[in-house]
């Protein structure tokens, strides 16, 4: 293939980026001087300092935060905790819990966003109750919790066909660590362990598709320069996570989250939608900085689209409002269902956004502290189904 044919495979913006990269490398090599005199060192340092800014900015453009950066998932992990209990037999689905707004675990008083009082298992997901999740984690036990966390893909590679996927094995606990009751309690509602957005999206897909964990991929097909198909990239099921029955139950719980729980702003007329909000306190906890998110899907009975939106430290006076992420996810979904040709299921207006319905906040608050090196980048939003916008890293919270 000649150069002209090769370049025809790329857009002009991609070609410009490749040219820029070549120029960057040439500039970098040009600054590597063999002159070790003091004057030369000072001069070279000035040049390299200036150019390093350019290099760093350029490299950031090529960083895929969805697979390279990690954060605590927050309450978007709660459906996994419930699915673990249902699948393992630790839960029957008929459980009730009593939430006083906090739970004393050892010597730590770990909070919930509201005083929920008596609450069913389904409502514990819909209303995002930390107290219920902690009790569920204790009922499952450390071994079962860790086993299913691994099955769902947390702490292991997704196998996506992209370079630069972060190794997160050290960012989750093992079964022996979960013998600490506080660790198990906070992990049950999505804090004190880290994951990438792709890990969350891939695992979540298995929750709602009947329990099949597919290898995520970007490339659908490889063609030759004359358009002939060289290779088709088909679907690859890596493992089974949960049963069809458990998956159907979890979908119904998350549909209620959108209908009457913390995700009501995700409603779109004519579409059945399920989802889960997330509001994770970042470290240090006392700074009250938050990583908010919403992961939603449609249709509920036979999901065709999943969108995961995150906002790191939203630029508002009250950050712990997952409704901001819900609204963004809804805007994305309204456009994407048209692009993908996903038709409305009904003209019933009962599942539309009610402007008078107050969006409940979903705060996975905890009084526990952990050491962390945190890289912050405020006001950044990403969707796993659309182009990523600089979703920054919040280092391992252990």
For the regions a language model picked out, list residue spans one by one.
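Short, gly/Ser/Thr-rich active-site loops of penicillin-recognizing serine hydrolases
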Residues: 229-234, 326-380
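Short, well-ordered alpha-helical segments
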Residues: 244, 248, 323-331
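A periodicity- and composition-biased signal for non-globular, repetitive helical segments
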Residues: 282, 365-366, 382-385
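Polycationic, low-complexity disordered segments in secreted or periplasmic proteins
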Residues: 373-394
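A short acidic/glycine-rich loop-to-helix N-cap element
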Residues: 313-324
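Beta-lactam-recognizing serine transpeptidase/beta-lactamase-like catalytic domain environment
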Residues: 1-75, 80-311, 393, 397-398
């Amino acid at each position: 293939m000649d150069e002209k044919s090769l370049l025809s495979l790329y857009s002009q913006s991609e070609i410009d980026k490749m040219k820029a990269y070549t120029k960057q490398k040439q500039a970098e090599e040009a600054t590597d001087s063999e002159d070790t005199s003091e004057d030369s060192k000072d001069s070279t340092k000035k040049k390299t300092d200036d150019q390093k800014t350019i290099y760093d900015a350029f490299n950031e453009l090529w960083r895929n935060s969805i697979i390279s950066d990690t954060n605590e998932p927050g309450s978007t992990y709660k459906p996994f905790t419930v699915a673990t209990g249902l699948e393992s037999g630790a839960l029957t689905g008929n459980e009730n819990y009593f939430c006083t707004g906090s739970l004393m675990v050892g010597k730590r008083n770990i909070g919930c966003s509201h005083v929920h009082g008596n609450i069913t298992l389904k409502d514990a997901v819909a209303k995002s109750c930390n107290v219920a999740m902690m009790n569920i984690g204790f009922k499952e036990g450390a071994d079962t919790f860790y086993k299913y966390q691994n099955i769902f893909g947390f702490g292991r590679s997704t196998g996506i066909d992209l370079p630069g996927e972060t190794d997160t094995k050290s960012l989750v606990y093992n079964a022996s660590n979960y013998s600490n009751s506080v660790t198990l309690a906070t992990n049950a509602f999505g804090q004190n362990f880290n994951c990438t957005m792709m890990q969350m999206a891939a695992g979540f897909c298995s929750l709602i598709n009947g329990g099949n964990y597919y290898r995520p991929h970007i490339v659908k097909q490889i063609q030759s320069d004359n358009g002939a198909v060289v290779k088709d990239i088909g679907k690859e099921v890596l493992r089974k996570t949960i049963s069809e029955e458990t998956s159907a139950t979890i979908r119904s719980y998350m549909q209620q989250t959108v209908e009457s729980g913390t995700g009501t702003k995700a409603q779109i007329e004519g579409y059945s939608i399920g989802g889960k909000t997330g509001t994770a306190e970042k470290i240090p906890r006392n700074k009250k900085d938050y990583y908010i998110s919403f992961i939603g899907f449609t249709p509920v009975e036979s999901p065709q689209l999943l969108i995961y939106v995150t906002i790191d430290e939203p630029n508002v006076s009250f950050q712990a409002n997952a409704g901001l992420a819900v609204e963004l996810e809804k805007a994305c979904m309204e456009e994407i269902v048209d692009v993908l040709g996903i038709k409305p299921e009904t003209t019933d207006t009962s599942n539309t956004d009610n402007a008078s319905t107050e969006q409940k906040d979903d705060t996975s608050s905890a009084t526990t502290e952990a050491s962390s090196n945190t890289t912050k980048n405020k006001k950044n939003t990403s969707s796993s189904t659309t182009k990523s916008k600089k979703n920054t890293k919040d280092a391992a919270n252990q």
